[in-house]
């Protein structure tokens, strides 16, 4: 449960602090160091993605995907545009659901299998179809598949960044391509193919686990199709932060 709490709440403290304190209390310093931070954010996106691709442990895989995702969040914050800032704020919300869902399901898988090594899983869609489908949906949200929650926020971050730092945004899109590798390859190994010996008698999600994961999956889907209520809450603050930092927004305001 510690991993889920960390992903849902604690790892957002840093990016919240960037918005709430760094930019608003030290706008001149933030403006000075913005190019450096954008560069570090792009490095984080690419580094986290490559490290995730090389992981053989499922929890390590999910952890490194978060490094890549937080690169997108930081890039959106320091793009200093209303779209980028709104996308970063929305990304924090979406990340809390999609990655926490991955950790939850991975925890249930490891509890049943007694292992966290990706190669020890295989053919789970035949043995535990409900658990397989929930893992697939959470993974596709982490991939930012259109129609799921992370797509909207990642799109806003990249569009908002492109208007001020086009090179960073273009390089950042490489993270999307790499995400397809670090999500789809494990999905293929874990859910498809022949059933790995030792997985034949694994049990599917019980009622308690289904009740726990169902609201998270529902939010992931709803936020992908209709993020407007959350954006309506986020946009005014995002626009004000950009103005307070002394930047003129080069793009139309989100939702206008």
Label each PLM-derived region with a short phrase.
Residues 128-131, 183-256:
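Cytoplasmic/organellar membrane-interface segments at the starts of transmembrane helices
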């Amino acid at each position: 449960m510690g991993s889920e709490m960390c992903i849902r709440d604690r790892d957002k403290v840093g990016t919240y602090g960037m918005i709430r304190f760094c930019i608003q209390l030290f706008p001149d310093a933030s403006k000075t160091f913005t190019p450096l931070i954008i560069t570090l954010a792009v490095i984080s996106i690419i580094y986290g993605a490559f490290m995730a691709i090389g992981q053989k442990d499922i929890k390590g895989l999910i952890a490194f995907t978060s490094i890549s995702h937080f690169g997108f969040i930081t890039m959106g914050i320091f793009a200093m545009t209303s779209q980028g800032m709104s996308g970063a704020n929305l990304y924090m919300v979406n990340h809390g659901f999609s990655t926490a869902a991955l950790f939850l399901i991975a925890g249930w898988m490891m509890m049943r299998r007694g292992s966290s090594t990706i190669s020890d899983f295989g053919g789970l869609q035949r043995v535990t179809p409900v658990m397989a489908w929930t893992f697939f949906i959470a993974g596709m949200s982490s991939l930012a598949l259109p129609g799921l929650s992370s797509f909207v926020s990642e799109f806003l971050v990249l569009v908002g960044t492109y208007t001020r730092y086009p090179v960073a945004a273009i390089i950042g899109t490489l993270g999307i391509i790499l995400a397809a590798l670090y999500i789809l390859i494990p999905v293929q190994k874990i859910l498809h193919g022949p059933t790995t010996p030792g997985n034949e008698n694994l049990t599917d999600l019980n009622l308690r686990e289904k009740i726990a994961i169902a609201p998270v999956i529902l939010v992931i889907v709803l936020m992908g199709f209709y993020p407007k209520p959350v954006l309506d809450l986020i946009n005014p603050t995002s626009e004000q932060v950009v103005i307070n930092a002394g930047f003129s927004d080069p793009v139309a305001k989100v939702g206008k």
